[in-house]
Design a protein with these regions (language model features):
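P-loop NTPase "switch/coupling" elements that transmit nucleotide state to mechanical/effector output
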Residues: 1-90, 100-272
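Conserved lysine of the Walker
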Residues: 95
């Protein structure tokens, strides 16, 4: 692989929202990109800097973030490597917007699609470039959420009203897998995006003091790629996992509507 480490961290600074500009708030952190040094952020209060693999400022688009930090992972997944993109941050930080795991981001014509719909387009571009006479491919997608320590299948037809028998297990080789989840075979980007849109609509959301439509669950979208080569009688499997972690903040800060402090505590325990 091009990158030398298995885990890389990107920091994204979102723009100020109207409530913050009305209060004359300013950014505490600023991007700092010195020559011949890793990208950094500058903490204005104490002038300290912290280095990351990628730093994106408030003006940077989803397109720039995707091309810099995510596109290489999708190419590696196409070549047989497993890859995960994990969005983590406080409620209202812009995780769902960045990941594109909100319903609006998966709809056709979305003005600023997030990582998930961009990854779908990119993956199909790569797969469609294969020589159909020498190699075939198959894609399957699953979409889960974890809410209050319950795992829900967002692609289950009755996911919003019925509990599904889903368990997380470990096989003999030490690999973690999810038993009982529905995997949908998809043959086109439109079919895959339709699955994701249905899953987004089923996600658990709630209004908070920090975000009117906050995702109150952790979501995990898994795209399983299978490439078959009849010439060499070989098959390559890989998985692209796209995780939108629900907001990380105290109940007093978020003021989550319809949730008790116990609900919020359980929500945080589900990360582990």
């Amino acid at each position: 692989m091009e990158q030398q480490t298995s885990v890389r961290v990107a920091l994204r600074l979102r723009p100020l929202v109207k409530k913050e500009t009305d209060l004359n708030d300013t950014h505490t952190l600023e991007p700092h990109n010195p020559p011949d040094a890793p990208p950094q952020v500058l903490v204005n209060t104490d002038k300290r800097t912290y280095a990351y693999d990628y730093v994106f400022g408030p003006q940077d688009t989803n397109a720039k973030l995707y091309e810099s930090a995510v596109a290489p992972l999708v190419r590696h997944c196409f070549n047989g490597y497993n890859a995960t993109v994990f969005a983590y941050g406080q409620t209202g930080a812009g995780k769902t917007y960045t990941m594109g795991s909100g319903a609006a981001s998966t709809e056709p014509g979305a003005t600023e699609p997030g990582i998930i719909p961009r990854a779908v387009d990119h993956l199909f571009e790569l797969l469609e470039s294969l020589d159909a006479d020498s190699e075939q491919y198959a894609l399957h997608v699953s979409y889960l959420e974890i809410h209050n320590e319950e795992v829900r299948d967002l692609l289950h037809p009755a996911a919003s009203s019925a509990k599904t028998n889903i368990t997380i297990r470990e096989d003999a080789a030490g690999d973690i897998f999810v038993h009982g989840v529905r995997e949908v075979a998809v043959g086109s980007r439109e079919a895959l995006l339709a699955c994701l849109e249905a899953g987004c609509d089923a996600r658990t959301t709630a209004s908070t003091l920090m975000n009117e439509y906050s995702s109150r669950s952790h979501s995990l979208c898994t795209i399983r790629v299978q490439r078959n080569s009849p010439e060499t009688a070989s098959t390559v499997f890989s998985k692209l996992r796209l995780v939108d972690h629900a907001g990380s903040a105290r109940a007093k800060t978020t003021g989550t509507a319809g949730q008790s402090p116990t609900d919020t505590a359980t929500h945080h325990q589900a990360r582990h």
